[in-house]
Amino acid sequence: MSLENKNIIITAGGTGGHIYPALAIAELLRQNKANVTWVGTPNSMEASIVPEYFNIQFIKSSGVRRKGIIKKITFPLKLAYNTLRSRSLLKKLKADLVIGFGGYVSGPICLAAALINIPVIIHEQNAKIGLTNRILAKFATTICLAFEIENLHKQFSSKQLAKTKLVGNPVRKDIVALNDKARIYTDSSTLKILVLGGSQGAKAINEIIPKLIRKSNEQGINIKVWHQTGKLSLEETKDAYKDISQNHIKDIAAFIDDMATAYNWADLVICRAGALTVSECAIAGLPAIFIPLPSAVDDHQFFNAQNIVNNNAGFCLRQQQMTLENLLAIIKPLNQDRSKLEQMSKMAKKTLIKNSSEQILDCVKKILNNK
């Protein structure tokens, strides 16, 4: 089925974990000749990223979690107001279908679509269903999941389960291309570690890595790092590396623009367990030490990592467990026997769900074909 002249609304915002999978789908829809419009919130991450690629419209929207009593009381009124505004926007755009990728902005847009009988697809990137998507699941035409959800039958009705599809997380093409490339782990004297703290950086990870390099050196383990610090921690982290030889440093940067090159360079990654990072590690076949963000809602980062960990393709340390001793206990055996890394790489690739973007595209076509 052709999507030519179909008006499809993408709504996602707040974090890269919501935005980048949505961008992958938006691009695929455009390649299939759909008219794609993004709806986000002003003064947000999507407001700075999306306009380079797609037309974007804005509505104001905010969440209610962990907010004061006044905001909780006024939230229903704001939601109703934003839903009415969203309804007007969808009519103006002559929307044929809405796809929600999470973030607070998805709530009013998807609710408004359901109220005026516009089909809605929601996509949950994490292994725990977020509050917005739990609410929207009642109204969605199709519910797409990135991970197997523990006890899903206790969270969804039989009707909701019937419209649920496991599709994985859409990932950028340059990273998908790494899946076809076998990782060869030689007995090189250098262990190349990519360090990622997520888009906001991770202070605890940034602080321990320079110490890890020094301690590893004492034990005869030659580590070289490519370290993404996040914008707020760049200078502080660079200072911590001052007495470390440049032979141990590939680069220290606030952000890494070319993640495919970074994943391809590394033997191992130390990172948070955001949904997109976990999915990219699986696709790239990159063994990982995951340090879930302690403050993540519903501890979702811990659960994101479990599929890879349970398949012996990675490790997971709680932040309080992220000591030099525990990190070295993982790294030392991998450095001594590189075949373990090679086996982990193969197992990581087995955990992924392939063709995620194409599966979501198929959902779009089926819904519009039956409309």
Curated annotation (Swiss-Prot):
Recorded superkingdom: Bacteria
Binding-site positions, UDP-N-acetyl-alpha-D-glucosamine: 15-17, 126, 172, 199, 256, 275-280, 301
Compartments, as annotated in UniProt: Cell inner membrane
One GO location term (cellular component): plasma membrane
Gene3D superfamilies the record matches: Glycogen Phosphorylase B
Family matches, as InterPro entries: GlcNAc_MurG, Glyco_trans_28_C, GlycoTrans_28_N
Top EC class of this enzyme: transferase
Pathway info: Cell wall biogenesis; peptidoglycan biosynthesis
Enzymatic reactions: di-trans,octa-cis-undecaprenyl diphospho-N-acetyl-alpha-D-muramoyl-L-alanyl-D-glutamyl-meso-2,6-diaminopimeloyl-D-alanyl-D-alanine + UDP-N-acetyl-alpha-D-glucosamine = di-trans,octa-cis-undecaprenyl diphospho-[N-acetyl-alpha-D-glucosaminyl-(1->4)]-N-acetyl-alpha-D-muramoyl-L-alanyl-D-glutamyl-meso-2,6-diaminopimeloyl-D-alanyl-D-alanine + UDP + H(+)
A molecular function (GO) term: UDP-N-acetyl-D-glucosamine:N-acetylmuramoyl-L-alanyl-D-glutamyl-meso-2,6-diaminopimelyl-D-alanyl-D-alanine-diphosphoundecaprenol 4-beta-N-acetylglucosaminlytransferase activity
Keywords on record: Cell cycle, Cell division, Cell inner membrane, Cell membrane, Cell shape, Cell wall biogenesis/degradation, Glycosyltransferase, Membrane, Peptidoglycan synthesis, Transferase
Any one GO BP annotation for this protein: cell division
Membrane topology: Peripheral membrane protein
EC number(s) recorded for this UniProt protein: 2.4.1.227
Entry function: Cell wall formation. Catalyzes the transfer of a GlcNAc subunit on undecaprenyl-pyrophosphoryl-MurNAc-pentapeptide (lipid intermediate I) to form undecaprenyl-pyrophosphoryl-MurNAc-(pentapeptide)GlcNAc (lipid intermediate II).
PANTHER family cross-referenced by the UniProt entry: GLYCOSYLTRANSFERASE, UDP-N-ACETYLGLUCOSAMINE--N-ACETYLMURAMYL-(PENTAPEPTIDE) PYROPHOSPHORYL-UNDECAPRENOL N-ACETYLGLUCOSAMINE TRANSFERASE 1
HAMAP family: MurG
The family this protein is said to belong to: Belongs to the glycosyltransferase 28 family. MurG subfamily.
Protein name (Swiss-Prot/TrEMBL): UDP-N-acetylglucosamine--N-acetylmuramyl-(pentapeptide) pyrophosphoryl-undecaprenol N-acetylglucosamine transferase
Protein species of origin: Francisella tularensis subsp. novicida (strain U112)
Originating gene: murG
